[in-house]
Curated annotation (Swiss-Prot):
<feature type="domain" description="EamA 2">
    <location>
        <begin position="195"/>
        <end position="319"/>
    </location>
</feature>
<feature type="domain" description="EamA 1">
    <location>
        <begin position="25"/>
        <end position="153"/>
    </location>
</feature>
<feature type="transmembrane region" description="Helical">
    <location>
        <begin position="179"/>
        <end position="199"/>
    </location>
</feature>
<dbReference type="Pfam" id="PF00892">
    <property type="entry name" value="EamA"/>
</dbReference>
<keyword id="KW-0677">Repeat</keyword>
<dbReference type="InterPro" id="IPR030184">
    <property type="entry name" value="WAT1-related"/>
</dbReference>
<dbReference type="GO" id="GO:0016020">
    <property type="term" value="C:membrane"/>
</dbReference>
<dbReference type="GO" id="GO:0022857">
    <property type="term" value="F:transmembrane transporter activity"/>
</dbReference>
<feature type="transmembrane region" description="Helical">
    <location>
        <begin position="276"/>
        <end position="296"/>
    </location>
</feature>
<feature type="region of interest" description="Disordered">
    <location>
        <begin position="338"/>
        <end position="367"/>
    </location>
</feature>
<feature type="transmembrane region" description="Helical">
    <location>
        <begin position="73"/>
        <end position="93"/>
    </location>
</feature>
<feature type="transmembrane region" description="Helical">
    <location>
        <begin position="10"/>
        <end position="30"/>
    </location>
</feature>
<feature type="transmembrane region" description="Helical">
    <location>
        <begin position="246"/>
        <end position="266"/>
    </location>
</feature>
<feature type="transmembrane region" description="Helical">
    <location>
        <begin position="40"/>
        <end position="60"/>
    </location>
</feature>
<feature type="transmembrane region" description="Helical">
    <location>
        <begin position="142"/>
        <end position="162"/>
    </location>
</feature>
<dbReference type="InterPro" id="IPR000620">
    <property type="entry name" value="EamA_dom"/>
</dbReference>
<comment type="similarity">
    <text>Belongs to the drug/metabolite transporter (DMT) superfamily. Plant drug/metabolite exporter (P-DME) (TC 2.A.7.4) family.</text>
</comment>
């Protein structure tokens, strides 16, 4: 029982928090690489190509598996669609970071839970009833988490820990045309992310093989982005050359920890917990970005960051409570239905006659 609880409750939370920390670091590394002149289209092609190579052995295991269903057209169609969504999401996201910063990317990602919740309701993956406290908790927690993330983004307040001269805030940068353009690209990305969650969840219901699906997905993203790169870069072969500097480090780290491990963990979490659960970890990224800035970059810590992080935590745990409440209600309903079915079998005439018929059959054999 304890092992099952750890695998279904503790492990997904721990893994997704670690992945949000990794994503903040990978976005910062990507920004440093693009400042050296690397094309972000080429970056996407190489990082997802590396992930596909790392996951390639999983294809042989899945095709030899007897427990998995056959890879039919419906599944392949959804994987192709997933690759197109992933290509659009990555291009929009990295374009946005290129025009703005990783911190703004973390801030705009707070729109993900709201978009995911709406799409999950539309596709009937989440139920909403104002009469149930679990549904109210999910809606309220989603709004509170988004609000807390925007507090971190837009409100500084007094300095709590002053380690360096005050850095330029998101609010002061909001008048920069490039910053606004970057925010627009990032908003499109974080509308594509919930679509990715929804489609991936549907694929997992039909074909529960995370490594195989992510491998095909990585091939698809690399292929579609390569076509876009041929159009954007033209005959510039120099854009495809990667120098042994921060660009190479960024591609390797993103391919291993981002495209490979991160996507696999998110796919696994989508299969066992659903899209809204996974999306609720996005507001944590802005708090993680602030914490990493204070610890590693010696940024100043403001009271607004502390207030916002507290609000995010309250909203996050409110949604988690609502999800746990729903799971408990479903389990209670299933248990009650099972008990009613057993009682009906015992009370039915056919159930009461099973023993006499068997006894009669035995007596006939001895005659």
């Amino acid at each position: 029982m304890a092992r099952k609880y750890f695998q279904r409750e503790v492990l997904p939370v721990t893994a997704l928090v670690i992945m949000e920390c990794a994503n903040v670091g990978l976005n910062t590394l990507f920004k440093a690489a693009t400042l050296k002149g690397m094309s972000f289209h080429v970056f996407i092609v190489y990082s997802y190509g590396l992930a596909a190579l790392l996951l390639l052995p999983s294809l042989f295991c899945s095709f030899r598996s007897r427990t998995l269903p056959p890879m039919n057209f419906s599944i392949l169609y959804k994987i192709v669609l997933l690759g197109i969504i992933g290509c659009c999401s990555n291009i929009m996201g990295y374009t946005g970071i290129n025009y703005s910063s990783p911190t703004l990317a973390s801030a705009i990602s707070n729109l993900t839970p709201a978009f995911t919740f709406l799409l999950a309701v539309v596709f009937r993956m989440e139920s909403v009833s104002f009469k149930r406290t679990s549904s109210v908790a999910k809606m309220l927690g989603t709004v509170v988490s988004i609000g807390g993330a925007f507090i971190v983004t837009l409100y500084n307040g007094p300095v709590v820990i002053a380690k360096s001269p005050p850095s330029v805030s998101l609010r002061s940068q909001s008048t920069n045309p490039n910053w606004i353009l970057g925010a627009g690209f990032l908003a499109v990305e974080y509308f594509c992310v919930p679509l990715w969650y929804i489609v991936q969840t549907q694929i997992m219901r039909e074909y529960p093989a995370e490594f195989t699906v992510v491998c095909f997905y990585s091939i698809g993203v690399s292929f579609w982005t390569a076509l876009v790169t041929l159009f954007t870069e033209g005959n510039d072969l120099g854009a495809w050359k990667i120098k042994p500097n921060i660009a190479l480090v960024s591609i390797v780290c993103s391919g291993l920890f981002g495209s490979c491990i991160n996507n696999t963990i998110h796919t696994w979490a989508l299969r066992i917990k659903g899209p809204l659960f996974v999306a609720m970890f996005k507001p944590l990224s802005i708090a993680i970005a602030v914490a990493m800035g204070v610890i590693f970059l010696r940024d100043s810590l403001y009271i607004g960051s502390l207030i916002g992080a507290t609000v995010i935590t309250i909203g996050f745990y409110t949604v988690m409570w609502g999800k746990a409440k729903e799971v408990a209600l479903v389990e209670d309903d299933n248990k009650a239905n099972h008990e009613e079915a057993n009682e009906a079998d015992l009370d039915s005439p056919s159930g009461s006659q099973k023993a006499p018929l068997l006894e009669s059959y035995k007596n006939d054999e001895h005659v």
